[in-house]
Amino acid sequence: MVPHLLLLCLLPLVRATEPHEGRADEQSAEAALAVPNASHFFSWNNYTFSDWQNFVGRRRYGAESQNPTVKALLIVAYSFIIVFSLFGNVLVCHVIFKNQRMHSATSLFIVNLAVADIMITLLNTPFTLVRFVNSTWIFGKGMCHVSRFAQYCSLHVSALTLTAIAVDRHQVIMHPLKPRISITKGVIYIAVIWTMATFFSLPHAICQKLFTFKYSEDIVRSLCLPDFPEPADLFWKYLDLATFILLYILPLLIISVAYARVAKKLWLCNMIGDVTTEQYFALRRKKKKTIKMLMLVVVLFALCWFPLNCYVLLLSSKVIRTNNALYFAFHWFAMSSTCYNPFIYCWLNENFRIELKALLSMCQRPPKPQEDRPPSPVPSFRVAWTEKNDGQRAPLANNLLPTSQLQSGKTDLSSVEPIVTMS
């Protein structure tokens, strides 16, 4: 809720700082960009006259920006994302790696999602903030490429990892008796995800160029802009269109279908055997909570990234012109998605909260001797989620379904539900 309120405050204030179309602004822009002796205002060391013409056509990209109030608001908004994203995602990785009971393929996917969020938080979000506040790129040519790569690669890794998690949960619920994905296969899937994300991100990273120009008599500025090969307009348009369809729309459709089927299965499944009224309503509450969590995953992923993806697609298609206020508001909103994933996938998980509390209690006080510790009333992960490291089900007699249930083809939701809430 807080990030959404910050976005509502951020957009009108930043929009108010956009340069007006008045005569004075037009004269200053033309004076800086269209004088006969253009070499006085532009670095010609590595560029051609066509580069200069393209740059002039995009001159509004680096408009003078922001009064002190808006700059302060931007710093607070982006700092909020950076702090919460780093804290939440690093904590997720630490808790999972620290606890042997949480080592599984699904946990690997969650860690992979956290790593992608950490990458974009460190390699893109701070640089975008500084660029907007200072109205110039100060990090050099190398980071111009790295920052763009981090943004696209993190987005693609997140989308593909969310898809892998959705498919994994779908298999668990729809086919509860089949073996889970092993850790070895999980590592292979993650390697494939990063390979695909790198392949689709490299064109965006390579086709970046650092333009340097003299903004005024005393100010020299640099801009990190896309610079695609000819025909540049078509290359840019179809690259963004392919990225939007293959790595946003398609994963979102797969996630939606998988979770819709899971939700239907959980909602229609009845607990097998005699149950009391209290047990029935408790099961119903668990069903609703699980369905809400699954739908929240889809909605947040779609909402956070749709504005920025749609804006970039329209911009590359020349349907709209560059607008700093919209771009940075949409960019901030997309970056805020890195704060939600730890809560959705881990902190809403009861078993993860138990592990987190145990970890925090160990940091606050020394552990008691082993013989003084009472047996834990909390069931182990392996009781509800019985799998070996090779993905095979452990032969626990207590977890085997009766023969009548196996022959009926029904799913005992009391054994399936804990798997959903932990994965």
UniProtKB/Swiss-Prot annotation:
<feature type="topological domain" description="Cytoplasmic">
    <location>
        <begin position="349"/>
        <end position="423"/>
    </location>
</feature>
<dbReference type="GO" id="GO:0007631">
    <property type="term" value="P:feeding behavior"/>
</dbReference>
<feature type="signal peptide">
    <location>
        <begin position="1"/>
        <end position="16"/>
    </location>
</feature>
<dbReference type="InterPro" id="IPR000276">
    <property type="entry name" value="GPCR_Rhodpsn"/>
</dbReference>
<dbReference type="GO" id="GO:0004983">
    <property type="term" value="F:neuropeptide Y receptor activity"/>
</dbReference>
<keyword id="KW-1133">Transmembrane helix</keyword>
<keyword id="KW-0297">G-protein coupled receptor</keyword>
<keyword id="KW-0675">Receptor</keyword>
<feature type="topological domain" description="Cytoplasmic">
    <location>
        <begin position="168"/>
        <end position="186"/>
    </location>
</feature>
<keyword id="KW-0732">Signal</keyword>
<dbReference type="GO" id="GO:0007200">
    <property type="term" value="P:phospholipase C-activating G protein-coupled receptor signaling pathway"/>
</dbReference>
<feature type="topological domain" description="Extracellular">
    <location>
        <begin position="18"/>
        <end position="71"/>
    </location>
</feature>
<feature type="glycosylation site" description="N-linked (GlcNAc...) asparagine">
    <location>
        <position position="37"/>
    </location>
</feature>
<protein>
    <recommendedName>
        <fullName>G-protein coupled receptor 83</fullName>
    </recommendedName>
</protein>
<feature type="transmembrane region" description="Helical; Name=1">
    <location>
        <begin position="72"/>
        <end position="92"/>
    </location>
</feature>
<feature type="glycosylation site" description="N-linked (GlcNAc...) asparagine">
    <location>
        <position position="134"/>
    </location>
</feature>
<comment type="function">
    <text>G-protein coupled receptor for PEN, a neuropeptide produced from the precursor protein, proSAAS (encoded by PCSK1N). Acts through a G(i)- and G(q)-alpha-alpha-mediated pathway in response to PEN. Plays a role in food intake and body weight regulation. May contribute to the regulation of anxiety-related behaviors.</text>
</comment>
<feature type="transmembrane region" description="Helical; Name=4">
    <location>
        <begin position="187"/>
        <end position="208"/>
    </location>
</feature>
<dbReference type="GO" id="GO:0005929">
    <property type="term" value="C:cilium"/>
</dbReference>
<keyword id="KW-1015">Disulfide bond</keyword>
<dbReference type="GO" id="GO:0008188">
    <property type="term" value="F:neuropeptide receptor activity"/>
</dbReference>
<feature type="topological domain" description="Extracellular">
    <location>
        <begin position="209"/>
        <end position="238"/>
    </location>
</feature>
<keyword id="KW-0812">Transmembrane</keyword>
<comment type="similarity">
    <text>Belongs to the G-protein coupled receptor 1 family.</text>
</comment>
<dbReference type="GO" id="GO:0051384">
    <property type="term" value="P:response to glucocorticoid"/>
</dbReference>
<keyword id="KW-0472">Membrane</keyword>
<feature type="compositionally biased region" description="Polar residues">
    <location>
        <begin position="402"/>
        <end position="414"/>
    </location>
</feature>
<feature type="region of interest" description="Disordered">
    <location>
        <begin position="402"/>
        <end position="423"/>
    </location>
</feature>
<keyword id="KW-0325">Glycoprotein</keyword>
<dbReference type="GO" id="GO:0007218">
    <property type="term" value="P:neuropeptide signaling pathway"/>
</dbReference>
<keyword id="KW-0807">Transducer</keyword>
<dbReference type="InterPro" id="IPR017452">
    <property type="entry name" value="GPCR_Rhodpsn_7TM"/>
</dbReference>
<dbReference type="GO" id="GO:0007186">
    <property type="term" value="P:G protein-coupled receptor signaling pathway"/>
</dbReference>
<dbReference type="GO" id="GO:0097730">
    <property type="term" value="C:non-motile cilium"/>
</dbReference>
<feature type="transmembrane region" description="Helical; Name=7">
    <location>
        <begin position="328"/>
        <end position="348"/>
    </location>
</feature>
<feature type="disulfide bond">
    <location>
        <begin position="144"/>
        <end position="224"/>
    </location>
</feature>
<feature type="topological domain" description="Extracellular">
    <location>
        <begin position="316"/>
        <end position="327"/>
    </location>
</feature>
<feature type="transmembrane region" description="Helical; Name=2">
    <location>
        <begin position="108"/>
        <end position="129"/>
    </location>
</feature>
<feature type="topological domain" description="Extracellular">
    <location>
        <begin position="130"/>
        <end position="145"/>
    </location>
</feature>
<feature type="transmembrane region" description="Helical; Name=5">
    <location>
        <begin position="239"/>
        <end position="260"/>
    </location>
</feature>
<feature type="transmembrane region" description="Helical; Name=6">
    <location>
        <begin position="294"/>
        <end position="315"/>
    </location>
</feature>
<dbReference type="Pfam" id="PF00001">
    <property type="entry name" value="7tm_1"/>
</dbReference>
